């Protein structure tokens, strides 16, 4: 185990929609990497139970995607509450990174943070105020060197742990191709 203030916390959520005021978190996963993006540990992958009335608020894209992946069924069968998910995730993070030092890392991570702020504020407070958002590099690459984007593709399973692994791989790709480090 390598507890360090240099470690990075990667998070991904799956939600019933895009508005934290009306939609809910249905899956959370986390990974801790070192500063060189080597995976040190994978946290719990948790389907968060939500009642049928919350699942009914999903649009067609969410319903189709989360049903096809098996996530809707996992959510229905889950006994994990939002608070349980917070407690289990923090318990994992405390073994690897001190509170308040790691930026929240991921792809379009601002959206996830909005949901954490609304539905899991205790977990949101575990992160530094900064973001490490891979999608920022993607947007800059799309504008300044679009041919580089052809060299990386995602599976797009929209399962939280898979999405984190892809985000880490994508950042490694940009480091090697754009930054040449």
Curated annotation (Swiss-Prot):
Q: Which GO terms describe its cellular component?
A: cytoplasm
Q: Where are the transmembrane segments?
A: none
Where does this protein reside within or beyond the cell? Cytoplasm
> Is Nuclease given among the entry's keywords?
yes
Q: Which Gene3D superfamilies match?
A: Ribonuclease H-like superfamily/Ribonuclease H (3.30.420.10)
**What positions does UniProt annotate as the active site of this protein?**
129
Which residue numbers delimit the Exonuclease domain?
8-171
Q: Which UniProt keywords apply?
A: Cytoplasm, Exonuclease, Hydrolase, Nuclease
| Pfam families, alphabetized | RNase_T
Q: What is its EC number?
A: 3.1.15.-
- Give GO terms for biological process: DNA metabolic process
A single GO molecular function term of this UniProt record: nucleic acid binding
Family to which the UniProt record says this protein belongs:
Belongs to the oligoribonuclease family.
Briefly state the protein's biological role: 3'-to-5' exoribonuclease specific for small oligoribonucleotides.
- Please identify the protein, giving its name as recorded: Oligoribonuclease
């Amino acid at each position: 185990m390598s507890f360090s203030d240099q470690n990075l916390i990667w998070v991904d959520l799956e939600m019933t929609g895009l508005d934290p005021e009306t939609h809910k978190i249905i899956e959370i996963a986390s990974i801790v990497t070192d500063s060189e993006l080597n995976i040190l540990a994978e946290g719990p992958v948790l389907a968060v139970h939500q009642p049928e009335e919350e699942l009914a608020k999903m649009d067609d894209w969410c319903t189709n995607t989360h049903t096809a992946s098996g996530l809707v069924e996992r959510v229905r069968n889950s006994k994990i509450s939002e608070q349980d998910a917070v407690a289990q995730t923090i318990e994992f993070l405390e073994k690897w990174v001190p509170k308040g030092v790691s930026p929240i890392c991921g792809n379009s991570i601002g959206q996830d943070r909005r949901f954490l702020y609304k539905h899991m504020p205790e977990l949101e407070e575990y992160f530094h105020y900064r973001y490490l958002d891979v999608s920022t590099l993607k947007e800059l690459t799309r504008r300044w060197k679009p041919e580089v984007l052809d060299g990386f593709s995602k599976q797009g399973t929209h399962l939280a742990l898979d999405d984190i692994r892809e985000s880490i791989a994508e950042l490694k790709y940009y480091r090697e191709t754009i930054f040449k480090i």
